[in-house]
Amino acid sequence: MPIKAILTDIEGTTSAVSFVFDVLFPFARAHLPDFVRQHAEQPQVAAQLQAVRTQSAEPDADVERVIAILLEWIAEDRKATPLKALQGMVWEQGYNAGQLKGHVYPDAVDALQHWHQQGYRLFVYSSGSIQAQQLIFGCSEAGDLSGLFSGYFDTTSGPKREAQSYQTIANATGFAAEEILFLSDIVEELDAAKAAGMLTCGLARDGGVLAGHRHVNSFTLIDPASF
């Protein structure tokens, strides 16, 4: 069955892991306190602050205490939904102000544009929120790439190392799993996608081996028609 759609990871695949850890996370950590103070009364922000109080079992926490909790979660690298939502809001403000530009490897830009022109449907699956995904591609160093993609998926579709998540995504795209090529730099994610019936290709940008999967070190070496 020929490939009709391509599902790609972001961190370590289309984009440098260092962009997330060395640029995005520090930017959010630096700007989150003032952002929360300035926007605490806005409904979408207030809802996330209330979620922090609930998850931390501190229902009476004031804004400064909530900020302290958020900074603790950042230090612990906790994947808390309200933290991710607030980080996304801070990043959006940064992208819109031109303070941030999404990193996408040039080889990934070229390949994604080429595949789109060839008629492949392109999708994203990342542990980062859908909003964060859209910002990386929509405000990238290479310009607005958002028009290349037909859909975005995050962990609301399930954990990235569980096969059921990939079946859920296949169902949402309208393609059979066997018609989808999944790209990632993490072997456990590739294993899960393969177990769901997808075809896989690993990105080993720094060399190395992704056991059990075809793997390359550049998007330019991926020919979807060869799978």
UniProtKB/Swiss-Prot annotation:
**Its EC number(s):** 3.1.3.77
**Needed cofactors:** Mg(2+)
What is one process in the GO biological process aspect for this record?
L-methionine salvage from methylthioadenosine
According to its UniProt record, in which pathway does this protein act? Amino-acid biosynthesis; L-methionine biosynthesis via salvage pathway; L-methionine from S-methyl-5-thio-alpha-D-ribose 1-phosphate: step 3/6; Amino-acid biosynthesis; L-methionine biosynthesis via salvage pathway; L-methionine from S-methyl-5-thio-alpha-D-ribose 1-phosphate: step 4/6
SS bond list = none
- Which Gene3D superfamilies does the UniProt entry name for this protein? 1.10.720.60, HAD superfamily/HAD-like
Cofactor, how bound (note): Binds 1 Mg(2+) ion per subunit.
Domain of life (superkingdom)? Bacteria
If you read the UniProt record, what top EC class would you report for this enzyme, in one word? hydrolase
| Catalyzed chemical reaction(s) | 5-methylsulfanyl-2,3-dioxopentyl phosphate + H2O = 1,2-dihydroxy-5-(methylsulfanyl)pent-1-en-3-one + phosphate
The record's InterPro entries line, in alphabetical order, gives: Enolase-ppase_E1, HAD-like_sf, HAD-SF_hydro_IA, HAD_sf
Q: Which UniProt keywords apply?
A: Amino-acid biosynthesis, Hydrolase, Magnesium, Metal-binding, Methionine biosynthesis
MF GO annotations: 2,3-diketo-5-methylthiopentyl-1-phosphate enolase activity; 2-hydroxy-3-keto-5-methylthiopentenyl-1-phosphate phosphatase activity; acireductone synthase activity; magnesium ion binding
Q: What this chain does, per the record?
A: Bifunctional enzyme that catalyzes the enolization of 2,3-diketo-5-methylthiopentyl-1-phosphate (DK-MTP-1-P) into the intermediate 2-hydroxy-3-keto-5-methylthiopentenyl-1-phosphate (HK-MTPenyl-1-P), which is then dephosphorylated to form the acireductone 1,2-dihydroxy-3-keto-5-methylthiopentene (DHK-MTPene).
Q: Which family does it belong to?
A: Belongs to the HAD-like hydrolase superfamily. MasA/MtnC family.
Q: How does it assemble?
A: Monomer.
Give the HAMAP family listed for this entry.
Answer: Salvage_MtnC
According to UniProt, the name of this protein is Enolase-phosphatase E1
The organism encoding this protein is Pseudomonas syringae pv. tomato (strain ATCC BAA-871 / DC3000)
